[in-house]
Amino acid sequence: MIHDIGSVCTYCGVGCDITAQVENNKILKIYAQSDGYVSQGKLCIKGKLGFDFVDSPLRIRNTRIKKSFIETNFESMPRELKARSNTLVSLDEDWFEATHEFGTSVAAWKLSEIKSTYGRHSFCATGGARTSCESGFLLQKFTRETMDSPNIDNCARVCHAPSLNGMAATIGEGAATNPYDDIYKTEFMLVIGSNTTEAHPIVANRMIEASRNKTAELVVCDVRNIQLGKFATKQVVLPYEANLLFLNAIAYVILKEFLYNP
């Protein structure tokens, strides 16, 4: 029986609404509902066709434990875990295949041992930027409450911590302040350092539409001659690594000519 499952695309930060058509626990196709608020009924090629990995034979389907880990830690294992180790199945020269229950029990025991031996600061966790809010909440809760560790991080911090601080100081919030459809209400769009049609195609659709309809001017500044530049009112192809210099030049002119609101 074929049925639909609604979800959110995780390929980029746009967050398009998607619907997966599923039969016998396998995805047949992914599409956007015609009334989708974010997607507007359209998906990029990655959102629409990028799901083959779900059923890839290369995916690891069962719990695995390193043979070297068992050899190193077997003597210090609790008796109950030693007794259950006979359920391990040799997969190759490096790995055992284990039941999910045994794998989680071994992981819980080892984490508890590390915490009691080396203290709470011996543990840290790094989350992913493409996971759900619920899994992010669960990871930080596990780190702070179960492991009693303040060492929780996210892969997005490396590149977005500076922008978060800068945006918070400038506009009061380190995140987007407007919904995508506000693009249709704006008069001017400045794109710098973003290949929007490649990285965030569904947002680029709105920008192109607004530019074509002459409701907003579009200025594109990039070190590459990107596709979005074809739809721009003005395009500036910058020398490599000149983004910051260009922004400083704009700031200089604004200050010198008093083009800011006092």
Language-model features: where?
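N-terminal export/assembly segments and adjacent metallocofactor-ligating motifs
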Residues: 1-257
